Amino acid sequence: ERLELLLSIFAKGERPSGSSDPYALRRAGNGLLQIVWDRGWRLDLSRFLGSAVEDWTALFPEFAIDSSALHQDLCQLLRQRIVSQLEDEGFAPDLVQAVSAESVATERLLSDPMDVRERLDLLNALRQSKALPALMAVVQRAARLAEKGDLVETDLNVSAVVSPERFESPSETAMYEVLVQLEPLASGRRYRD
């Protein structure tokens, strides 16, 4: 129902703007996300929206729908709703930004909103346990080093991008070994193991 409302109003060319949202489209987006989170569904919303848009385009050719623009606009609305809803639930804005900043592709964000929620829950738990500052220091150092290189930022395969023979200290070797152990957990989205 919520998806149908979003599709139909967006297909008409109407969008929420500023404080104006006469069809409660933002609320429909929030409801859609809340259902996904409450049920724990692993749903690629971007792909799902893409299929729905293509179906609507085929069903209603008289509307002359620009399916690419419609898909992009719907994804952007849901991206904004993810950020807004997580902040409204009381998560710290810096943690919400850590999992959903503009540097995170919308496609990645919507490919599994449940994953976004789980990563945010993990960061929140790390902050509460006082372990987050130490982890942030390591991640920031690694990010600064990666910026100096030519790595693709989405490549998380440690053994493919790191040359242990170039290490100069035991701490580098220890860090590498930890990352190799964590890699299958991260790729399997098992953040708490």
Residue ranges and their predicted role:
Residues 2-193:
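Amphipathic alpha-helical "coupling" segments that flank catalytic cores
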